[in-house]
Each structure stands twice: as C-alpha cells, then as structure tokens.
Amino acid sequence: MKVKAFKTESKIAAGLVFLFVVSLIPVFLVGSYGYPSADDYGFSAYSHIAWMNTHSVWQTVKGACATVVERWYGWQGTFSSIFLMALQPGIWGMYGLVPFIMIGAVSLSTLYFLHTILIRVIHARPAVFIGMSMLYLLFAVQCMVDKTQGFFWYNGAAHYILPHSAALFLCALCIRLLTEERKKAYRLFMACLLAVFVGGSNYVTALIAAVLFVTAAGLLFLVKKGNKSRLLALPFLFFLAAFLLNAFAPGNAVRQEEMVVRPGVMKSILLSFYYCVEYVVDIWFNWAYLLFVLALIPFLWEAVRALGSRFSYRAPLVVLGYSYCVLSAMFTPSLFATGDVGGGRIFNIIFLDSMLFVMLNLFYCMGWLYRKFEAFRCMTGAAKETESCFERKDVRWYLAGVLCFGIFIGAMYMKVNPDYFTTVSAVHSLVTGEAAAFGAETDERETLLQEAVESGEAEIEIPRLTVHPYLLFWSDIEEGAEDWTNKSMARYYQKEAVFGVKR
C-alpha cells in the first residue's frame, strides 16, 4: 500500500519529540539537587571507602564486587543489581546524574525495542515509530507511579528501572536474532551479556524474562519454525544460570527469616490476579491513562496498515488473556517473598509494562478489525486507502479533540495535585525555592561529614533534613544513632556513629 502524503504525522511526531525534550529540562535541573539516602550508603560503603583511599576506579570496582559477595551470602542473591547499587554516583559527588541515567535508560531501551517492532518487523514509517515512542515516554516519565524511586533515588531505581531497561534491550536483540541475518554474532554476544544481567537482577524482571523466553520458543514451534529456537538457546542458558545463582543464594534464606507472614505458592498466584486488576485497571487507569490511549489510536492504525495482510490477528482474546497473566505474574514474587504486594519501585516497572501491553492489545484488536474491514471493502468494491489517516479531516478533528481533552486533564491534575506530573512537580520545587533549600541543607551536611572525615572524629552529629521535596526526598537518618540508616551512613564515612539531631 502506497501512501501519498504523511506530512501531518511527521509534524505531530516532531512536535512530540520537542515536547518530550522540553519537559525533561526542569526534571534534570531539579535532579541536580539530588542527594544519597538510606540504602545508597549501605550498598556503596566499600566502593566509597575504596575511592576515598585510593582514587582508583579499579579499586572502587573491587569494592563493588566485595559488596556483591557479602550481600549474596548475607542478604540477597540479586548480584547484578547489587553491583550497580554499589556504584552509586554519589561516590564521585555526582548524584545529580541519577535522573539522566534512569530516564536515559528508559528512553533508549524503549526506543530500541519499539524501533525493532515497528520499523524492523512491521515496516511502519519513521514518523509512526517516533510518535508512538514519544507518547509512551511522555506518559511514562510524567505519570510514573513512584517518581522518586523511579528517577531520583538511585538505589531503588538501579534495582528495578535499569534491569527493566536491560530486559527491553534483550527482547529486541532476540527479535532481531530471529528476523535478521546481519550481525548475528554481535547480537548473540550482547544478548548473552544482557541475559546474565537480567537473570541476576530483581525477581520481577527475571520472572517475566523467563516467561517471555518460554513464550518465544512455544510460538516458534507453533508456527513450525522450531529450528529457529536454537538462536535463543544460548541466551536462555546464560539467563538460566544467572537466575539459579540468584535464586539459590544463601542470603535469600537469611532475608526470608525476617518475613513472618508469607502466603504459599498458590495463594500468591491467586492474589496476583486480584492485585493486577486492582492496580492496573482500578488505580492506575485514570483520565491521564485514557488520554494516552486516545492519542495512540491514529499511530496504531497506521502501524496496522503498514503490516497489512501479512498477519491474520486470529486470537485477540488469547492475546488479552496472555497479557493479563503476564502482568499478574509481576505481582507474584513480592507476594510470595514478603506477603506484601510491593512498593513503588516494583509498581514502576509493572506500570511501564502495562503500557506496553495496552499498546499490544490495542494494536492487535485494531488489526483484527482492519482485516474484517478489509474483507468488507473487497466485497463492496470500495477503493483502497491511499494516504495517511492523519491527512483526513475527521482524524484531524479527532486529534484536536484529544489535544483539548489533554489540556483540560493536565490543568485539572495540576490544580488538584501539583506532584502528579513529574515536570510540574519539578517546576514547583524550583520556583518555590524548595529544591534550593533542600540542596543547601544537604550541602551543609556534606561539609560537616567531610570535615569529620578529615579530622578523624569517631562520632558526629548531623542535623536532620527539614525540607522534603516530593521528587528529591526519599528518607533521612533518625534521631540518635541506632537506626539502620544512621549505621549505614556511619559505615559509608568510616565513623563509629552518626547521630541525627533536630535542626
């Protein structure tokens, strides 16, 4: 099918890129005031001590490896996540890079994954790929469930956002291994590296990666291309080895001893189906999510047209059911391990994947309708479409309506909750001086700590933070010196005790 004109979709795609880039400016500016907290200190103590004593990158990496070994035996098996957590940017005084790292990881992995699907497999036009990618990223960044743990607190984001991004890269590489002949050796090597990283990361991402590996093999055999599954065998074996090393770490048993109430396997699975509906449908699907869906529809329609009759879309209900099962499975590890549905950092990656599954199901259902409509066209002798749907007057009116709806929804949410959108929250913190005040308090704290390091004091009193910006503040030390956060900070700075005192 040839398309005569697609200027409008190109302009819209360019506008979305501009909007996304501009929306990040306040986010990165407020991120410059970021400061380590809680587990940032505990997991990076060895690395920080090594850097302060030697200023050697190699010795710092060795410190991170020592942390991996200690935690693997004593607390948790997620070795690849621990390695990253042990190298938090605050070691080098660059904690302000955290939002660049996290948003960059989400953006690059999403772009690579959607480019693989839309350009390499479906053969959609670049403007369609860019438009869909920007809509996804805009909604992901602005409406993340827990923005602090997603983009600003390194320890939480490194454990979930970075493995999620690695898993997207891994999925895209596996698809390219199956569909393209070029660069197979390079892609296989990179897929194996990423498979090890994902297998050694958080259990939510690792479990879904295992499900997708099995699904891919099953689909290949179903379409009688089982011989291609050997291309995925090596990455899967690397993933499996890493996952087993992760799951059977002695530290996991130590940590489980602290979990008093834990449901069994079957109850955890059943609860997962319940919580999937509660969170994905009831809590997260709001007016902003509806706006995301409405804005996607014209781009998805063009993707469906690009694929044309090369796919039959025979089982929309099966795809819907599969999506529900996979998203439900993402709730299971936390329920089984702790008896709790999980925290914001876990919700973040479930939220990101739910958006991808919404895109998949919308695409599949629209494809099913397209094939039915195509058959009807043939029967009635109607002419084939010859231009992008964005050039049609009715679609332009539809997009104008979506834009007005978006402005209304944005204004409503900003009025009711200024922290709902990440950019608005960042602007609020910058304009009110809240971010600068937080930065002044953390700078004062850092000065006191560095002076204590230079003077060799064994104990030090640190004023507790009084300014708590929504995006920047995760937690603080407690009064006295006995809380685990105080002990982590003391270990990080090689002190016998850090006392939190009222300012």
Language model segments and positions:
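Signature aromatic-anchored transmembrane alpha helix within multi-pass, membrane-resident enzymes
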Residues: 307, 314-320, 368-417
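Transmembrane alpha-helical segments
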Residues: 106-117, 166-178, 211-218, 293-300, ...
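Transmembrane catalytic cores of multi-pass membrane glycosyltransferases
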Residues: 26-96, 102, 154, 199, ...
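Membrane-interface micro-motifs in multi-pass membrane enzymes
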Residues: 39, 125-175, 202, 329-363
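Short hydrophobic alpha-helices at membrane interfaces in multi-pass membrane enzymes
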Residues: 176-197
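Membrane-embedded, lumen/periplasm-facing catalytic core of multi-pass transferases
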Residues: 344, 398-482
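Transmembrane-helix motifs of polytopic, lipid-linked glycan transferases
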Residues: 101-126, 130-131, 136, 169
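Start-transfer (signal-anchor) and selected internal transmembrane alpha helices
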Residues: 1-25
